[in-house]
Amino acid sequence: MNRILGWFAVLVLAMCSATWAQGPETVVTDSLGRSVHIPVPVRRVVSLSASGVECIRIMERIDTLVGITEHTKTRKAQFPEVARLPSVGRGFMPNFEVIAELRPDVILAWKTNPGPELERQLEPLGIAVLRLDLTEPGKLPEEMRTLASILGPEAQKRTKAYWEWVARWTEQIQKSIAVQPKPTVLAEHFTPLRIAGPGSGLYDLTQMAGANNLADDIGIRSMQVDSEWVLERNPQFFVKSILLGKRNAEEDTRRTDECLRSVLE
């Protein structure tokens, strides 16, 4: 009963704040192609993805973050600046009560996760929901520019400088691999023997790096396989993707290595 009353009090406070805080806003297009109205200036942001936190850090607007997910909090080595921020729960299943208590101007979410319940719960409280994946290399520049546009001129300036730097290095890399034979590769998508497929950022990166990815026919962004499947494809290189700062990264690597060696032996 006390929890229900607490949530009701938060709801009333947030709705009152939303009513009194009406003011200037900007309209941006999110990854779903929707027009999203964002109050400006944006001072308080909750990010449901670690990639969102990373992009905000590139823009040097960590000061706007007021809440992150439990997953991001576990990556203290990668994100020491935000480790002390409140957790809003899991990225796919956030705690709406905690989010309402934090009173963000905007919540940053993936394109399709969490589902539409996010908008149903938060938009009546005056909290804008901005859906940007911020993971696919081909879409990342435009999505970062969209995010920077709500975080102010300095964020836009730093985003522009960042992509100019990326473009210079991309050009150099592409020149260096233009005449090289393409090595065959498979890439593991964080979890042991979960292979990255077309449409995933990791798959796209292997293509950009000049490799011939042997998972081009699986038809989905990632697929769980076994060690026999990997050895049948017989890649020259096997790329292990890890999460920086994650406590069990070494354990995941050991498990993958053991799976592959067990078949070879």
Language-model features, listed with the residues they occupy:
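Positively charged n-region of N-terminal signal peptides that target proteins for export
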Residues: 1-6
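Bacterial N-terminal signal peptides
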Residues: 7-16
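Boundary at the C-terminal end of the N-terminal hydrophobic targeting segment
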Residues: 19-23
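Extracytoplasmic substrate-binding proteins
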Residues: 25, 35, 106, 116-194, ...
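A short, structured surface patch at a secondary-structure boundary
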Residues: 44-102, 106-111, 214
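Alpha-helical, coiled-coil/dimerization segments enriched in small aliphatic residues
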Residues: 74, 196-222
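Proline-aspartate-enriched helix->loop->beta-strand connector
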Residues: 88, 95-112, 127, 227-243
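A ligand-binding cleft/hinge motif common to bilobed small-molecule-binding domains
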Residues: 113-124, 240-263
